[in-house]
Curated annotation (Swiss-Prot):
List of residues that carry Phosphoserine: S351, S355, S392, S462, S481, S491, S503, S519, S522
Gene Ontology biological process terms, A to Z: autophagy; cellular response to glucose starvation; cellular response to nutrient levels; cholesterol biosynthetic process; energy homeostasis; fatty acid biosynthetic process; fatty acid homeostasis; glucose homeostasis
Subunit structure: AMPK is a heterotrimer of an alpha catalytic subunit (PRKAA1 or PRKAA2), a beta (PRKAB1 or PRKAB2) and a gamma non-catalytic subunits (PRKAG1, PRKAG2 or PRKAG3). Interacts with FNIP1 and FNIP2.
EC identifiers of the protein: 2.7.11.1, 2.7.11.31, 2.7.11.26
Protein name: 5'-AMP-activated protein kinase catalytic subunit alpha-1
Species classification: Eukaryota, Metazoa, Chordata, Craniata, Vertebrata
Domain notes: The AIS (autoinhibitory sequence) region shows some sequence similarity with the ubiquitin-associated domains and represses kinase activity.
């Protein structure tokens, strides 16, 4: 949902503009609707790119009616080679789109500085770009301004397509009449003012990008614009001798003047040059994607995000109205799940770039990680235990014996909301240490002792978060670590139980003060020993983890 600023639309922070939790910095670029600035999280230092859309310009272009639902859908886009939209902040004068920031700069600048890429590297980047284009086309979004300036590179030289954000949703029979984009990359039908449907113009632009990767120059270029237009409309371009004949045939098919004869994504995917060394995760297969079965979880998520009824969504699906934003959102959710599953399998079997999923890190010692949204930015360290914001202030803290984790590319707030929902469903009690750090406990009905664990959300990289499960052995460890209140009663009464009222919870907190000590002493002087057997705490911890993971996976 769009977040409204409660006070002034722009707040000053030490002379700098602040939007939400982000301090705006240098301008990264200027577009049709406004500027793109780098933003830095005021607490963590995490960088984002903030696109500023001027409401007056949006009104003048008559796109107010569709931009809200379109942006809502774009927030669902999750693809390893498309810049992600994290958050939208709305003010009376502007709309701020908080997006993924990558450090490698534009592909355009890289080519200008380093010249053409070798064939293998060109193919690798082109495969990534086409995968992103295909993902958006299947969800009724056309870019219309693909060019090396809109392809960004991350720290590992992987492609990230930017600026899908303001493209129109495609509809059958609805042609995109707006001639936009850079002439050098524009298809003949665009510059000549003819009607065009959308996907085919992205294919042309992708062909120009492929040529630039392989040759270091543009296929159509001239300082005199009328001459440039003639070259594009003639479709004749120079092919250097060093080019592979196979890739020349692909380029000629993609840069076909007649859009009806131009290559489709299916044609490109089946081309022998493109298929070589193609990672499976870029085009995952899913036999259930076109299934007529309705996914209840996806249906529920669409209703929550769009504040609509199930009947509205089902009506779009049953009527096969695939262009409706509700239907697009539904298929996006299912598609995201499919892509993540396929990508996980791929990355477990290969050595992937660090920029996507990072599941291979699970087999190595913990790398440096930065906690998300904590009160301070700690020094770089090497274990999850040391990175706990409270524990880091204390020396000699014993490392937890166990840690488990779930990785996700969802937004941090969404992850924690799902975690709290699952905890509530399991009837566990929990205490909020900070919005991204919870302590959870479950009472053993036999021994009346509590099994306790902590849940901490960590940021692994700019796209991935790790929900860390840690066993809490005893109250003494908690008190020393600074994560619990020194008084037992204070610690207990701060736990939340969804089944009780506040007064009931307070009464339970007082009575539980005794039961907390029952793990080491009996409730009275009788010889009954309720001390858990060695290892039982570990077993109960794993049971808690398993129950929670099962709910989260539903």
């Amino acid at each position: 949902s769009w977040r409204k600023m409660a006070t002034a639309e722009k707040q000053k922070h030490d002379g700098r503009v602040r939007i939400g939790h982000y301090i705006l910095g240098d301008t990264l670029g200027v577009g049709t609707f406004g500027k793109v600035k780098v933003g830095k999280h005021e607490l963590t230092g995490h960088k984002v790119a903030v696109k500023i859309l001027n409401r007056q310009k949006i009104r003048s272009l008559d796109v107010v009616g569709k931009i809200r639902r379109e942006i809502q859908n774009l927030k669902l886009f999750r693809h390893p080679h498309i810049i992600k939209l994290y958050q939208v902040i709305s003010t009376p004068s502007d709309i701020f789109m908080v997006m993924e920031y990558v450090s490698g700069g534009e592909l355009f600048d890289y080519i200008c500085k380093n010249g053409r890429l070798d064939e293998k590297e060109s193919r690798r980047l082109f495969q990534q770009i086409l995968s992103g284009v295909d993902y958006c086309h299947r969800h009724m979004v056309v870019h219309r301004d693909l060019k090396p300036e809109n392809v960004l590179l991350d720290a590992h030289m992987n492609a990230k397509i930017a600026d899908f954000g303001l493209s129109n949703m495609m509809s059958d029979g609805e042609f995109l009449r707006t001639s936009c984009g850079s002439p050098n990359y524009a298809a003949p039908e665009v510059i000549s003012g003819r009607l065009y449907a959308g996907p085919e113009v992205d294919i042309w632009s992708s062909g120009v990008i492929l040529y630039a990767l392989l040759c270091g120059t543009l296929p159509f270029d001239d300082d005199h614009v009328p001459t440039l237009f003639k070259k594009i409309c003639d479709g004749i371009f120079y092919t250097p001798q060093y080019l592979n004949p196979s890739v020349i045939s692909l380029l000629k098919h993609m840069l076909q003047v007649d859009p009806m004869k131009r290559a489709t994504i299916k044609d490109i995917r089946e081309h022998e040059w493109f298929k070589q060394d193609l990672p499976k995760y870029l085009f995952p297969e899913d036999p259930s994607y076109s299934s007529t079965m309705i996914d209840d979880e996806a249906l529920k998520e669409v209703c929550e995000k769009f504040e609509c009824s199930e009947e509205e969504v089902l009506s779009c699906l049953y009527n096969r109205n695939h262009q409706d934003p509700l239907a697009v959102a539904y298929h996006l959710i299912i598609d995201n799940r499919r892509i993540m599953n396929e990508a996980k399998d791929f990355y477990l079997a290969t050595s992937p770039p660090d920029s996507f999923l990072d599941d291979h890190h699970l087999t190595r010692p913990h790398p440096e990680r930065v906690p998300f949204l904590v009160a301070e930015t700690p020094r770089a360290r090497h274990t999850l235990d040391e990175l706990n914001p409270q524990k880091s202030k204390h020396q000699g803290v014993r490392k937890a014996k166990w840690h488990l984790g779930i990785r996700s590319q969802s937004r941090p707030n969404d992850i924690m909301a799902e975690v709290c929902r699952a905890i509530k469903q399991l009837d566990y009690e929990w205490k909020v240490v900070n919005p991204y750090y919870l302590r959870v406990r479950r009472k053993n009905p036999v021994t009346s002792t509590y099994s306790k664990m902590s849940l901490q959300l960590y940021q692994v990289d700019s796209r991935t978060y790790l929900l860390d499960f840690r066993s809490i052995d005893d109250e003494i460890t908690e008190a020393k670590s600074g994560t619990a209140t020194p008084q037992r009663s204070g610690s207990v009464s701060n736990y939340r139980s969804c089944q009780r009222s506040d007064s009931d919870a307070e009464a339970q907190g007082k009575s539980s003060e005794v039961s907390l000590t029952s793990s080491v002493t009996s409730l009275d002087s009788s010889p009954v020993d309720l001390t858990p057997r060695p290892g039982s705490h570990t077993i109960e911890f794993f049971e808690m983890c398993a129950n929670l993971i099962k709910i989260l996976a539903q």
